Amino acid sequence: MPKVDLFNQNGEKVGDLQLADSVFGVEVNTYAMHQVVKALLANKRQGTQSAKTRAEVSGGGIKPWRQKGTGRARQGSIRAPQWIHGGIVFAPKPRDYRMSIPKSMKKVAIKSALTSKVNEKLMVVVDDIKLETPKTKEVVKMLNAFNAKKTLIITNNAEENVYKSARNIEGVQIIPVNNINVYDILKYDKVVITKDAVSKIEEVYA
């Protein structure tokens, strides 16, 4: 069973925390993580790119000059792809890029991503993160205490003052535990997570 240090938001160690093997100590499945990240990125694509082929460009129905005797290369239409304003070869058309992933694979991918952060000692567990008023410098101070630059902060309920304080810090993203996904966990170098968020993850994914 993995054990990590438990800190307060000032960066001081206040104890230890045992993590569930079934969530934070699984065998890392890189294939599942790759598939889920690929699906997440594909599902963000609009798929609205479009261009006209030579058949769809208006005009060009008449041969621009006679076949022989001009000294120029033979041409059949001014809308052929080699002409300016001609059609596009293999023109892109609107399409749906969406991919569906089984829930079981998403679950495996989340657990694999969390385990990889624990294994690499890139997960910091904090007993709680609270601010009386929005103060960006307080969050920066906390992150500096953990030597965290490009960081994902996961809280149990994304307290408004903490959210407002962290949202404008470059390279930092804060999300409630209900919104965690593989892409964000892997994208950021370090994960700072509250103790309550860890409990919630273990409750949902164990």
From Swiss-Prot:
<keyword id="KW-0699">rRNA-binding</keyword>
<keyword id="KW-0689">Ribosomal protein</keyword>
<dbReference type="GO" id="GO:0005840">
    <property type="term" value="C:ribosome"/>
</dbReference>
<feature type="region of interest" description="Disordered">
    <location>
        <begin position="47"/>
        <end position="75"/>
    </location>
</feature>
<dbReference type="InterPro" id="IPR013005">
    <property type="entry name" value="Ribosomal_uL4-like"/>
</dbReference>
<dbReference type="GO" id="GO:0003735">
    <property type="term" value="F:structural constituent of ribosome"/>
</dbReference>
<comment type="function">
    <text>Forms part of the polypeptide exit tunnel.</text>
</comment>
<dbReference type="InterPro" id="IPR023574">
    <property type="entry name" value="Ribosomal_uL4_dom_sf"/>
</dbReference>
<keyword id="KW-0687">Ribonucleoprotein</keyword>
<dbReference type="GO" id="GO:0006412">
    <property type="term" value="P:translation"/>
</dbReference>
<dbReference type="GO" id="GO:0019843">
    <property type="term" value="F:rRNA binding"/>
</dbReference>
<keyword id="KW-0694">RNA-binding</keyword>
<comment type="function">
    <text>One of the primary rRNA binding proteins, this protein initially binds near the 5'-end of the 23S rRNA. It is important during the early stages of 50S assembly. It makes multiple contacts with different domains of the 23S rRNA in the assembled 50S subunit and ribosome.</text>
</comment>
<protein>
    <recommendedName>
        <fullName>Large ribosomal subunit protein uL4</fullName>
    </recommendedName>
</protein>
<dbReference type="GO" id="GO:1990904">
    <property type="term" value="C:ribonucleoprotein complex"/>
</dbReference>
<comment type="similarity">
    <text>Belongs to the universal ribosomal protein uL4 family.</text>
</comment>
<dbReference type="Pfam" id="PF00573">
    <property type="entry name" value="Ribosomal_L4"/>
</dbReference>
<comment type="subunit">
    <text>Part of the 50S ribosomal subunit.</text>
</comment>
<dbReference type="InterPro" id="IPR002136">
    <property type="entry name" value="Ribosomal_uL4"/>
</dbReference>
